[in-house]
Structure formats: structure tokens, C-alpha cells
A protein has these predicted regions:
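N-terminal DNA-binding module of tyrosine recombinases/phage integrases
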Residues: 1-44, 59
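N-terminal core-binding DNA-recognition domain of tyrosine recombinases/integrases
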Residues: 27-41, 51-153
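Short, conserved phosphate/pyrophosphate- and ester-handling motifs at nucleotide-, phospho-/glycolipid
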Residues: 158
Length: 160
């Protein structure tokens, strides 16, 4: 492996560990569990997406609201329903994300179908892993439909 790729992988690994500190402790086991079958980039993308999901639970969930993400337990996820995940998908249309470099400011975020699908994939993987390991008794994420991705029109260049 080239030095550049090795250096990039090391940076991504350190960034992943940094983000995991903001997430519930059981998420670390999830990342260890998928490490053999996913790339560092995939795990990092999942970490970003799960951070948004847990921030949503903190800000919006009817019973988990107000519980810091790093204080959540796997038992708390038993309170999450497929309807909650549907609401999360709607939340992704527009939300204000904290600026992690400068916490006093927020950044407006919008997600179209592709962004929502990617975030749903991360949530599904987490619930699937926890269900498979018998940490939770149900997998509500599997009941949520993936957003339909609309095809972009093919733009052809004309010869002048």
C-alpha cells in the first residue's frame, strides 16, 4: 500500500475514533463488528450519519429527547419505532447541524433522496447488527422504506 493511502487510512481511523467519543458506547462494538467487512471510509461515513441520527433523538424524540447521545444505552433504542425513523427521514430534509469547529454557530443542512438513503443505510446497519447480536429485541429500521431516488436526465453534448 502506498504511503499516501496508508496515511489517509490512519487519518480516517483517528477521525472515526474522535466521532465515536460523541456516540453511545454500544456503537463502538458495532464499528468493531463491521470492521472486517467494510472500509475505513465506509465506517467513517456511518459515524457521521449515526451522529446525526443520535443528535436527532436528543433534539426531537418524545422520550429520549434531552439524553445526550453518549449517555444512551442499547436499551434506550428499544423505544425507537419505525415511525420515529420515518420522522428522522423527514427531519433530514432540513435541519441545523452544530458546527463542530465552532459550537456557537450552526450550519443549515438539506438532504435529497440520495443523502437520506445513505443515512438510512447507516441506521439500518446499526439496528441490524444490534438485533443480530440479540442486544435489542426488534429491528424497526428494516420496516422503513428507502426513499425513491429519481434519475437525473442524461445531458448530451452536441457537436458544433
Amino acid at each position: 500500500m502506498s504511503d499516501y493511502r496508508e496515511e489517509l487510512k490512519n487519518k480516517e481511523t483517528l477521525r472515526l475514533r474522535e466521532i465515536q467519543r460523541e456516540l453511545p458506547p454500544f456503537v463502538q462494538a458495532f464499528f468493531r463488528g463491521i470492521a472486517q467487512t467494510t472500509s475505513t471510509k465506509t465506517r467513517l461515513a456511518y459515524a457521521y450519519d449515526l451522529r446525526i441520527f443520535f443528535r436527532y433523538l436528543y433534539e426531537e424524540h418524545r422520550t429520549l429527547g434531552g439524553i445526550e447521545p453518549k449517555d444512551l444505552t442499547a436499551a434506550h433504542l428499544s423505544e425507537v419505532t419505525s415511525e420515529d425513523i420515518d420522522c428522522f427521514m423527514e427531519y433530514l430534509s432540513y435541519y441545523i447541524r452544530p458546527d463542530y469547529e465552532n459550537p456557537a454557530y450552526g450550519k443549515e443542512m438539506h438532504n435529497e433522496e440520495k443523502g437520506k438513503s445513505r443515512k438510512l443505510a447507516a441506521v439500518r446497519m446499526l439496528f441490524k447488527y444490534l438485533y443480530k447480536k440479540k442486544i435489542i429485541s426488534a429491528d424497526p429500521a428494516s420496516l422503513v422504506d428507502t426513499p425513491k431516488i429519481h434519475e437525473k436526465a442524461i445531458v448530451r453534448l452536441d457537436v458544433n
